[in-house]
């Protein structure tokens, strides 16, 4: 990962760590990744990608549907969870996003951790709820 991402900021690299973990675990290479300025992204895509809101509510509004996750893979380590998921629309089960996330469970409410472990609701939805 380091060679491919040498021109990307350390902050972006840290966001890619969960994805890199699962790709490495499966002996797969990450797809080509580059950073671009948000002004170079077309309007519709920019509204979906370049914002300060949570991604779950942004995608839910755009697709006019609640979302759920399909967990493709996960890894627990003490109170830290890495998971790779597909977000899907509840109204037709179509995928709208693929991604991986790291979640520090130690500071979260027990009922929220239980829902995270069930693996059905996106983290953004749970953060709204709790």
Protein language model features and the residues they cover:
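N-terminal domain-onset segments
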Residues: 1-82, 86-130
């Amino acid at each position: 990962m380091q060679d491919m991402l040498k021109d990307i900021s350390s902050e972006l690299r840290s966001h890619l760590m969960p994805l890199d973990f699962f790709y490495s675990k499966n002996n797969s290479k990450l797809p080509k990744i580059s950073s671009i300025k948000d002004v170079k992204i077309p309007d519709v895509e920019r509204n979906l990608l370049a914002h300060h809101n949570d991604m779950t509510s942004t995608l839910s509004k755009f697709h006019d549907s609640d979302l759920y996750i399909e967990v493709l893979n996960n890894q627990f380590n003490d109170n830290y969870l890495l998971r790779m998921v597909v977000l899907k629309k509840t109204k037709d089960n179509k995928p709208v996003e693929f991604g991986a996330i790291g979640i520090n469970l130690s500071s979260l409410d027990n009922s929220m951790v239980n829902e995270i472990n069930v693996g059905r609701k996106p983290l953004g939805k749970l953060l709204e709820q709790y």
